[in-house]
């Protein structure tokens, strides 16, 4: 099976997702695939400090997403998700066809802060495609398949929950 194809059919992909296997070819920032089993996630030790720093700045120091972007862009030399994926593609001799954003954005920070994959949870079946070439529709959270303690966490569940509380508080003010 080619390493870039995780599922050959929608039914096969759904079956793997139902059984707790990671089926998305794009990995969450901070994780790598197991070379022997591409459906398993492992922490990328090179990127662990970036994710930890983002959560620390947001939860412990009370810094907002925009300020976190400014800090990452000026003080640290951490690659953005798209720059990192491009580097990994080039290392393997492949072409990265997606647009590359060299500076951190609030959107990237939000994606990291809102994704429970960082506390060891795998969530599958988040979207559904209605027709063959149709647009994917987001499904309600009740329909997601959730696998707690699926892989090694970068941050604790408590830290993740605190980040969600802070986010909700900021939305309500």
Annotate each language-model stretch with its function.
Residues 1-173:
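Conserved catalytic breakage-reunion loop centered on the nucleophilic residue
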């Amino acid at each position: 099976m080619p390493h870039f194809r995780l599922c050959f059919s929608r039914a096969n992909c759904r079956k793997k997702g139902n059984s707790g296997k990671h089926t998305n070819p794009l990995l969450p920032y901070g994780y790598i695939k197991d070379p022997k089993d591409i459906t398993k996630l492992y922490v990328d030790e090179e990127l662990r400090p970036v994710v930890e720093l983002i959560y620390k700045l947001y939860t412990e120091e009370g810094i907002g997403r925009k300020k976190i972007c400014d800090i990452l862009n000026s003080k640290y030399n951490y690659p953005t998700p798209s720059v990192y994926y491009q580097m990994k593609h080039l290392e393997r001799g492949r072409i990265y066809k997606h647009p590359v954003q060299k500076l951190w954005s609030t959107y990237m920070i939000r994606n990291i802060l809102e994704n429970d994959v960082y506390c060891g949870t795998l969530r599958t079946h988040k979207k559904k495609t209605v027709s063959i070439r149709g647009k994917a529709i987001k499904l309600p959270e009740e329909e997601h398949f959730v696998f707690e303690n699926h892989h090694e966490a970068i941050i604790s569940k408590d830290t993740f929950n605190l980040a969600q509380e802070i986010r909700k508080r900021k939305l309500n003010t």
